[in-house]
Structures are given as structure tokens and as C-alpha cells.
Amino acid sequence: MKIRKSTLSDESDVKALWGYCFEPPTDPFFQWYFKELAKPEEILVGENQGSIACDLHRRPYDLSIRGLRYPVDYIVGVATHPAARMRGYAKELIRGEFHLALKEDKPFVILMPSAASFYLPMGFGFYAHQWERSAAPERLAALGRRAESCRTLTSSNDWKDLASIYREYTKKRNGWAYRDEKSWEKHIDAQLLEGYIAVTYDRKGPSGYLFYTLDDRKMIASEMAFKNEAGRKALYAFMAGHQGSVDTCVWYEPLDDHSFRYWQDGAEHTYIKNRTFPFMLGRVIDPVIAFDGLPCSKEIKGEIA
């Protein structure tokens, strides 16, 4: 199988493969993705006997790890033509991505797996875990506190409000993606195709935001960020305000969050489900670039035998 970057002449085949495996061409996200985001040079294809057997999309990101900035490929849309499956083509293509990332001095590649068991034998490992929490909206009311004000976004014009929250939320954490104006606009536009964005405010300005969808009487918050505890409680109150509209709210918070220890009346596992949820895989491509000069926390103590 020949592995190469796609060209404009591959566009119809690439779209057809995405449409078969993911969203159909009539889906708004499909149309937006291939108009605004996908670039031929960021798509890797596996060609067999003159036809595209498989492909993957390489979304470029910069991650913050211990204060250093690393360029990475975020792999999405791994797809194999139905007539070419069960032949190991996708794994061969992913290994081709490893070689290309190494050539481009990218120390890691990352992805969000639909089936982790497919990727683990290729050297991937979970590097990001989070809390998955769910509760009936009326139960969240006891933990929330109404914001000074709240609104839902209808465009990416107010991206700076979200950026200020995200910056505060991530500043002491690792593995988060750098976002500039252009990436924020794309991120917001993609969310508004399929769902909603709520922003809460206190007297000082933006305090929290929520990316969410409503489907089958369930609210699912795919991204949540806040500047402080008041911002978190404001988002809880926003979700609680959907009593009568939804039966369940599902949201995610970072693994270093210990707020559940202070929930009232033994809420954890009683009326708020709280479980760890691994969700991102990473694979080290170049250990030297990845670890050379990486600082360690001054709080770490110990000896090397």
C-alpha cells in the first residue's frame, strides 16, 4: 500500500469515505468541515492499486506540557473503505503517520478513540482522564448558585469571553491546547452547528462557559470551563434550570477536581454519579524532543537508585 498526503484530486474519494464512516454529505457538520477545516495536505491516504483504501486526518495542535509548547498531530477520521477492511491497512497507515510526524519534529500524536483496544497495541496509552458526572437537573440545583447574568452565544464574535475563561481554567494544568482567535472561531462555529454555548458572568466579567447539546431529554456538556468556584456553581445552576426539559445532565470535569468531597448529603453515587473516564490517547514519537529539557515540579522529592 502506498501512503501519501492527499491532493485536490482525491477530494471526492476522501469525502465519500468520510460520508460512509461518519456523517453523510447532507449533514451540516460534514459540509462545514470540508469547507472550513479540512485541507488536502493534512490528510494522509493509503492507496492500493490506484484506489484510496483508507485515510486519516491530521489536525495540527500545540499542547502545553509543564509550561513548554509542543506541536502535535491530533488524529481524527481514521476510516477504511468497506472493501478494504480486515487487511491491516488502517494500522499500516497509522504507522505511516508516526514516520511523518517524526519527520516533522512532532514528539507526540494524540487521538480520541472510539475503540481504544485498536490503538493500544500500537504503543498508544491514555494520557488524559476526567470525571464524568451525571445527575437529574433538580439535584444540581442544590449545588448551584445563579450567576449575575447568563446568555447563549449565536456566533463566534465574542470568542474573547471564552478565551479569558479558558486561560484561567488551564493555567495550572497540563495537556491543554493553545487557542488563538482563528482556532476559537472554528471551535465555536463547529459547536453551534450541533449544539449550544452558554456563558455566565459575575460582576467582574465572564466566569464560566458550557458547550452542550440537547437530545432525547438529555443535556450533554462536552466542554466546561470556569474561572472560580462561583463560575462552576453558576454553570451548575444553568444546567439545573433545564428541569422539565431534560431528565439527565451529563458533564465532565478534570481529574484534579475534588469538589465532590464537599457535596451535600452524600451526593456522590447517591444522586450524582461520579466516575473516572479516560478519554485521550497519546503516542510518543520522538522521546528526545518529548522529554529533553522538560522541567519537573519543584515539589517532587525522592531519589534515583
Predicted regions and their residues:
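Short amphipathic alpha-helix that is part of the acyltransferase structural core
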Residues: M1-P60, G67-Y74, A141-K182, D215-S222, ...
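A short, internal acetyl-CoA/4′-phosphopantetheine-binding micro-motif in the GNAT/acyltransferase core
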Residues: I75-R85, S114, K218-E229
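Conserved acetyl-CoA pyrophosphate-binding loop and the N-cap/start of the following alpha-helix
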Residues: A84-G96, A230-A234
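Conserved GNAT acetyl-CoA-binding A-motif
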Residues: I94, H99-P113, G244-P254
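Conserved active-site alpha-helix within GNAT-family acetyltransferase domains
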Residues: K103-P107, P113-W131, D256-I272
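Intrinsically disordered, low-complexity, positively biased terminal segments
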Residues: R146-A305
